[in-house]
Amino acid sequence: MENNNYNNHVSGENSGGQRGHFFYGGNQVLGGAAPIYGRGGDCYDPMIVKTEGGGSTSHHNHTFHYPSIIRNHHHDSTETSGGGAGAGEVIEALKAKIIAHPQCSNLLDAYMDCQKVGAPPEVAARLSAVRQEFEARQRRSLTDRDVSKDPELDQFMEAYYDMLVKYREELTRPLQEAMEFMQKIEAQLNMLGNAPVRIFNSEDKCEGVGSSEEDQDNSGGETELPEIDPRAEDRELKNHLLRKYSGYLSSLKQELSKKKKKGKLPKDARQKLITWWELHYKWPYPSESEKVALAESTGLDQKQINNWFINQRKRHWKPSEDMQFMVMDGLHPQSAAALYMEGHYMGEGPFRLGQ
C-alpha cells in the first residue's frame, strides 16, 4: 500500500532525531486491532491522537465521532458476504476513503511542515522529494475511484489538519526565539569587536539550521582570524559608549543648564533694578520701604532683591574714602547718604564714584 511505504520512509528519516513524531498512518493507524495509535483494542473507541517529542509525551484527546463510519462499513460488509468479511476489509475501505479525501493533500503538507521545523536543508529536501513521490502515487491510485461525500470524514480531516497547524506553530516558536536571541548576541559582539561575527548563517530558515558536510570539508577545520588593531578597538568602544549613553549625557547637560539659568532674574525685573541702581549710584543702599516698592514692581521677593544689590555692589561699586570714614565713625548709612547727597563732604556737581 502506498501509504505504508510513505510512512516507513518518513519514519526512517526521523529515526535519529529528537523531534516530535506523529502516528496517523501506516500499520500503527489502520492495521490490527487499533486503527489509530493510542486507541484501545476496540475499533469503536473514541479517537486519541498522540504526539511524541524530545522525552515528553502529550496526548490530544479529540473525539471526532468517526466510529459510525466503521460501523456502517462493517454492517455493509456483513450483509454482503454474510459475515465472512473480516475487519481488514473495513479498515482498507476506510483507509482508501482517507487517501481519496480532498483534504488529504493539505493534511500531508501540514505533517511535512512539522517534520521540517529545525531540520537541516538536506533532510528538508529529502522530505519534499518523498512528499512529491507520494502525491504522484496518490494521483495514479485515484483515477478509477469514486469519491463520495462524507460529513464525518470531513470533520475528522479538518480537525486533524488544524491540530497539525497548531503543533507546527508550537514547534516553530521556541526555535524562532532562539534565533532572535542569537542575532541579538551577534549584533552586540559586532559592536564590541572589529570584525563581524557570524554565529549562524542568517540566510538559513527554520528548515535549515544545521550546516552541510561539504562546508565542513572545505573549511579544513581552520578559521582565519582577522588582525585586530588596538586603537580601532578603543575607537569602537568609545563610539559604542557614546551611542549607549548619549541620551543620558544630553539630559544631564540640559538639567545642569536649567540649574544655571535658575539663578538669573527675569529680564524686566533686572532692568528695573538696574534703573534704580543708576539713579542711586552714589549710595546704592535701598531702604526697607524702597525694597518693598521694588519687590512689588519687579515681582521678586526681598531676599532676591537683597542678594542682587549685594552682588551688584561687590562687582560694580566702590565707595569713596570720605564715605568709608563716615561709616567707620558710626554714622548710619542712610544719614551718611543724606549728608553725601547734600554735598557736605563732596563738591557740587555730578560725580560718580569709582569712575
Swiss-Prot record:
Positions of the ELK domain: 236-256
GO annotations of cellular component type: nucleus
Keywords: DNA-binding, Homeobox, Nucleus
Disulfide-bonded cysteines: none
Location(s), subcellular: Nucleus
InterPro entries recorded: ELK_dom (IPR005539), HD (IPR001356), Homeobox_CS (IPR017970), Homeodomain-like_sf (IPR009057), KN_HD (IPR008422), KNOX1 (IPR005540), KNOX2 (IPR005541), TALE_homeobox (IPR050224)
Domain of life the protein comes from: Eukaryota
Renumbered residue ranges of the record's region Disordered: 205-233
Coiled-coil residue windows: none
Gene Ontology terms for molecular function: DNA binding; DNA-binding transcription factor activity, RNA polymerase II-specific
Tissue note: Expressed in the apical meristems, in the newly emerged lateral primordia in the floral bud, in their vascular bundles and in the cortex parenchyma of the floral pedicle. Also present in the lateral tips of leaf primordia.
DNA-binding interval(s): 257-320
Chief location category: nucleus
Annotated SUPFAM superfamilies: Homeodomain-like
Function summary: Appears to be involved in meristem formation and in the regulation of leaf morphology. Misexpression makes the leaf more compound which is always associated with growth retardation and loss of apical dominance, resulting in dwarfed, bushy plants. Probably binds to the DNA sequence 5'-TGAC-3'.
Family label: Belongs to the TALE/KNOX homeobox family.
Listed name of the protein: Homeotic protein knotted-1
The species this protein was found in: Solanum lycopersicum
Underlying gene: KN1
